[in-house]
Amino acid sequence: MELRARGWWLLCAAAALVACTRGDPASKSRSCSEVRQIYGAKGFSLSDVPQAEISGEHLRICPQGYTCCTSEMEENLANHSRMELETALHDSSRALQATLATQLHGIDDHFQRLLNDSERTLQDAFPGAFGDLYTQNTRAFRDLYAELRLYYRGANLHLEETLAEFWARLLERLFKQLHPQLLLPDDYLDCLGKQAEALRPFGDAPRELRLRATRAFVAARSFVQGLGVASDVVRKVAQVPLAPECSRAVMKLVYCAHCRGVPGARPCPDYCRNVLKGCLANQADLDAEWRNLLDSMVLITDKFWGPSGAEYVIGSVHMWLAEAINALQDNKDTLTAKVIQGCGNPKVNPHGSGPEEKRRRAKLALQEKSSTGTLEKLVSEAKAQLRDIQDYWISLPGTLCSEKMAMSPASDDRCWNGISKGRYLPEVMGDGLANQINNPEVEVDITKPDMTIRQQIMQLKIMTNRLRGAYGGNDVDFQDASDDGSGSGSGGGCPDDACGRRVSKKSSSSRTPLIHALPGLSEQEGQKTSAATRPEPHYFFLLFLFTLVLAAARPRWR
């Protein structure tokens, strides 16, 4: 009888063990068919993809509950999620660069066309208006326009000195042409040059051109240069690689729901923002100087209008040149007398002809040209675009979450919070590197800013200072603002209020969300939801039953 009782004990214990091992119908592993379909659609082999959920102790990024992912699948999806984010960043960068390039080319082409039209008018009208005074000096005029183009394009020229040298050379050549009967050696011409400022042989034209051209050209080229620097900054920042911590966080954001067997769960909005704010923390630090640059560019467009504005002045250079030659011819006799008085009587040239009595006058209409409205339209479009992209760097995480990360439309019990389907409770971090010290999703070392981005912040500062100088009409030294080495090492320290803080740590208390049961959620699904954070209870029950079996069998072993 005692043996029969022991047998029943053993039989019951064995049945209990089998039942616990197989589980009740509600706790059977879910199918991975949907995950297999999505995984295969991304070009991966399905040979090692499980048909149903398996234990997830092997996972290194995703929660280690029941899973549809093997280690290889997790690694493949992690690499794929990183490439998807990199592609999204590059696409956004290219779109912004294209916007800036469109504005740059439109306005740059317009200013260059104005200068080309001015030179073409000069070439067409001056031969008939001034004869040999122009045709024998075409190279001097051609060189002037060439240097104006170089200056506009950002060459390191001093415009006032360039214009002064042009007028000095032109005065020497024209004075000799107007007095072919005189011998004018170099020392005599040097004396002429020294008296030129007091004699004002070209009237007010040189001074007017200098004052207006300096302000007009520096305003035009600083605006175009600003567009170029902005585009170059965007291009270089797009080349900054994602940190390994970011790659892990993005995998968890995008594909751990698939591994968890809930591929339909889309990332919670605040969860997505925290991940990308951590990933793009350095990029957000561009915001302040980026805004300063765009504000300065909008402001400098005020210098494009009116009689001293860039549009009128650049397109009217030939008119001041014509006015200058007219003044020289008008004042020829008075000028000659004053030069002889100051420099002495020059010798007569025995081979020279007599003074040309027939004075040729320009027939150019010197009235102000009416605006075609082209520049107004281009500038209006550019200013609107610049205002639209002012918050580009700090809005980038939200934009990517909305457009590229298939973010859930609302933060509710049905979105993916990084562990399961449920609400995401941590607060959203601020913008920039210093604000990521407590980011619950991405481990960010706020004491180590990205040096490439710090260099680009310095480039924005340099360009902004040039624009502000240009607004005041100053002839700014336009060395290449896109030089990779410029500003190297500058701005590399952490912000004053953040120095001394250490790398951010993920707080389990702030990270673990509360899990709310969904309507119709089975007991099996509820258990699997929390599998990553607590042990399965039936393991304790198995241990208890196994102890009973040993106790029942002990007398038999004696």
Swiss-Prot record:
One GO-annotated biological process of the protein: myelin assembly
Compartments, as annotated in UniProt: Cell membrane; Endosome
Residue ranges, annotated region (Disordered): 478-531
Keyword entries, A-Z: Cell membrane, Copper, Disulfide bond, Endosome, Glycoprotein, GPI-anchor, Heparan sulfate, Lipoprotein, Membrane, Proteoglycan, Secreted, Signal, Zinc
GO CC annotations on file: cell surface; endosome; extracellular matrix; extracellular region; membrane raft; neuronal cell body; plasma membrane; side of membrane
Domain of life, source organism: Eukaryota
Post-translational modification: S-nitrosylated in a Cu(2+)-dependent manner. Nitric acid (NO) is released from the nitrosylated cysteines by ascorbate or by some other reducing agent, in a Cu(2+) or Zn(2+) dependent manner. This free nitric oxide is then capable of cleaving the heparan sulfate side chains. N- and O-glycosylated. N-glycosylation is mainly of the complex type containing sialic acid. O-glycosylated with heparan sulfate. The heparan sulfate chains can be cleaved either by the action of heparanase or, degraded by a deaminative process that uses nitric oxide (NO) released from the S-nitrosylated cysteines. This process is triggered by ascorbate, or by some other reducing agent, in a Cu(2+)- or Zn(2+) dependent manner. Cu(2+) ions are provided by ceruloproteins such as APP, PRNP or CP which associate with GCP1 in intracellular compartments or lipid rafts.
Membrane topology: Lipid-anchor; GPI-anchor
List of glycosylated residues: 79, 116, 486, 488, 490
Entries under PROSITE patterns matching the protein: GLYPICAN (PS01207)
Family indicated by similarity: Belongs to the glypican family.
Name the UniProt record assigns to this protein: Glypican-1
Lineage: Eukaryota, Metazoa, Chordata, Craniata, Vertebrata
GN (gene name): Gpc1
